[in-house]
Curated annotation (Swiss-Prot):
Residues 1-15 are peroxisomal. The gene is PEX3. Keywords: Membrane, Peroxisome, Peroxisome biogenesis, Transmembrane, Transmembrane helix. Residues 37-457 are cytoplasmic. Belongs to the peroxin-3 family. This is Peroxisomal biogenesis factor 3.
């Protein structure tokens, strides 16, 4: 039996060796392919996970931009309302009406001035309580015509100033927070790579790793991530720059808007009747003049380097170099300033962030988005005015209403509607339809995505 087996093996030795080799090679190849497929599958999982994290963090960053905007809105609108006191002018007009009626010995309730009554309506004079009635005495010597002209100019100026400043703030915050969020994500990704691959990498970007703490796996790491906030002085200083628009920059915008409004509306009598289309055309002409002025290059104080030209948009968002320390003093405490000035690297890091931010602000895409935000805001407001005018035309006795052309109305009545809509622009609640629309434009998301994905910056 054993001899037979030996003879059999001897006769088929080459075949057995060949078969064994084939099996061994097949196993090796199979193992190699299986390992490579497993590695590829693992890499795909990691890439998909990373993409999902990027999407989640990007979405969260955009939400943070909106919430930050709403929180800063009262700070932005309050000085604008103090500078353009439309309600104070309406009260002065009301006083003159009362005096005239008193002189005629007629009851106040018999007056029929729908334009003035609308302007003085409590429905939209939500800022009246903030005004000091004693201030109205300053304008006692002005004529009724002067007051109406002031009401016309300041109502429209305030409306457009709010829209332009809010649009600038929206874009500014989206640029700021997406720059920081991208840097934070990169830092976190490097930390993850060094941990999983055993690579020791140093933190060179000096950015905060705390937001979302997506990759921290235990409480000890979470505590370490939180403690890093004290080291991110450059990031805190960078975020402080929104103070400039809120406290100084808006004035330049207001001045440009004011002169443009005077150019277009200066010769129009408040009692002149206009169709909504004619009024929209005038507003659009005013916007075109404003855009031309605020985007025009001008010689200004240097922001990052001597001799650089700038525009009203940039100077309203970023302070000149000699005012940067003043800005930090206004927005931070002494402890922060001491720690910040102790390391020159902090100033260099802030300069890098500001240079990137200014690079975006000088881009034509950003200018186009700012103009688009204003255009959309104007369109939404005019649509609301049209709806209100149509509601006034409805006959409550008819069940089905046939759409009719909106008749011309006095400019004074349109000013009342603009004032009402301006007050809506100051409402920082989450259900503000106009502000929500502005913050969710596709073009704005595209800009944010380009900033967030610019890993070469």
């Amino acid at each position: 039996m054993f001899q037979y087996c030996r003879d059999l093996v001897s006769r088929h030795k080459k075949k057995l060796l060949f078969g064994t080799g084939v099996i061994a090679v097949s196993y090796a190849v199979s193992s190699f392919v299986s390992n490579k497929l497993a590695e590829l599958n693992e890499r795909l999982k990691e890439e998909n996970f990373a993409k999902e994290q990027i999407k989640r963090r990007f979405k969260q960053t955009q939400n943070d931009c909106y919430m930050t905007f709403l929180s800063l809105l009262p700070v932005l609108t309050e000085p604008i309302y103090e500078a353009l006191k439309v309600e104070e002018i309406t009260r002065e007009l009301q006083n003159k009406r009362f005096e005239r009626q008193k002189a005629k010995n007629a009851p106040v309730g018999n007056s029929t001035d729908p334009a003035l009554s609308t302007v003085l309506s409590d429905d939209f004079s939500v800022h009246n309580e903030k005004e000091n009635p004693m201030h109205t005495g300053v304008q006692q010597t002005k004529s009724k015509t002067q007051l109406w002209n002031e009401l016309r100019n300041q109502s429209i100026t305030r409306f457009l100033t709010l829209l332009y400043c809010e649009s600038l703030l929206i874009v500014f915050l989206h640029l700021q927070l997406n720059i920081l969020s991208r840097r934070s994500y990169l830092e976190t990704a490097i930390k993850l790579a060094s941990k999983t691959k055993g690579i020791k990498l140093e933190n060179e970007s000096n950015v905060d790793l705390d937001p979302a703490n997506l990759f921290l796996e235990n409480d000890e790491e979470l505590a370490m991530g939180s403690s890093r906030q004290d080291e991110n002085l450059a990031e805190q200083a960078f975020l402080s720059y929104s103070w400039w628009l809120l406290n100084k920059g808006w004035i330049d915008i207001k001045n440009q808007v004011e002169s443009s409004v005077e150019d277009i509306f200066g010769d129009i009598n408040p009692r002149q009747e206009l169709s909504i289309e004619e009024f929209a055309t005038l507003i659009n002409k005013t916007q075109q003049i404003i855009d031309k002025q605020i985007y025009a290059e001008k010689e200004s104080e240097p922001l990052t380097a001597p001799g650089h030209s700038s525009s009203t948009v940039i100077t309203s968002l970023l302070p000149p170099a000699n005012m940067e320390l003043f800005l930090l003093q206004q927005t931070n405490d002494m402890e922060f300033l001491t720690n910040f000035n102790n390391n020159i690297q902090n100033s260099e890091n802030v300069s890098k962030l500001l240079n990137e931010l200014k690079g975006y602000l000088m881009n034509d895409q950003v200018s186009a988005i700012i103009s688009l935000l204003v255009t959309v805001g104007i369109s939404k407001v005019l649509d609301n005015i049209v709806v209100n005018l149509m509601n006034k035309q409805k006959n409550p006795d008819q069940e089905e209403q046939v759409p009719t052309e909106i008749p011309k109305v006095k400019l004074a009545s349109l000013l009342a509607s603009i004032t009402k809509q301006s007050n809506q622009l100051t409402n920082n609640s989450l259900d503000n339809e106009v502000l929500y629309t502005l913050n969710n434009l596709q073009e704005l998301d595209d800009l944010s995505a380009s900033v967030y994905s610019n890993f070469d910056a």
